[in-house]
Regions:
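Short beta-strand edge/turn micro-motifs at domain boundaries
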Residues: 93-124, 141-169
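Intrinsically disordered, low-complexity acidic Ser/Thr-rich regulatory segments
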Residues: 39, 44-54, 119-146
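Beta-strand elements of well-folded, non-transmembrane domains
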Residues: 79-85, 157
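Extracytoplasmic/secreted envelope proteins and their assembly/folding machinery
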Residues: 6, 10, 63, 91-95
Length: 169
């Protein structure tokens, strides 16, 4: 989870577990902003932000108990988790920030559009708003409440690999 690598998570957790955690949804919402059309600065800021929120999602994790029974094992863990349920990563904040930026930098952006075209204009906007947008979003996610986590993970051996098949909180 800390690496924000859904592909790796899919190798160790069942689809039911992943869908219940909403990690894939969060990652997908943010990954839409890593396309080339957004420009290098915006993509880099998006990736940095994405890694930061996934890194802070679960902290102070401690294994409290392990019970093995053949091809099934349960692991009880405690720790802390951020509650991002009220934090939105949708396009509305992006649109609002972009609109404000365009209004404040009309002359400069008009020149870029005239001399370099629409694509350069859009990248200039994204480059300009990236620090503003991600600073605001960072403050929002850092202020998200931290909750105590107590969970029991169920792991099952399938095809010689241990897969997380359940999480009970």
């Amino acid at each position: 989870v800390k690496e924000c690598d859904i592909t790796k998570l899919k190798k160790v957790a069942s689809e039911d577990v992943l869908s219940g955690m909403d990690l894939e949804k969060m990652e997908k919402e943010l990954s839409q902003y890593t396309e080339e059309e957004y420009g290098k600065v915006f993509v880099d800021e998006t990736n940095k932000f994405k890694k930061a929120i996934f890194k802070d999602l679960f902290t102070d994790i401690k294994i409290k108990d392990i019970k093995a029974d053949g091809d099934k094992t349960t692991v009880k863990v405690t720790g802390k988790q951020k509650d991002y349920s009220q934090v939105s990563f949708d396009q509305s904040e992006l649109n609002t920030t972009a609109q404000q930026y365009v209004e404040e930098h009309q002359d400069e952006l008009a020149k870029v559009y005239k001399e370099e075209g629409l694509s350069a204009y859009q990248i200039k906007v994204y480059d300009g708003i990236a620090p503003i947008l991600y600073q605001s979003m960072t403050e929002t996610y850092k202020s998200a409440p931290t909750e105590k986590l107590t969970a029991t993970f169920t792991l099952e051996k399938k095809n010689d690999k241990w897969i997380i098949t359940g999480i009970d909180e």
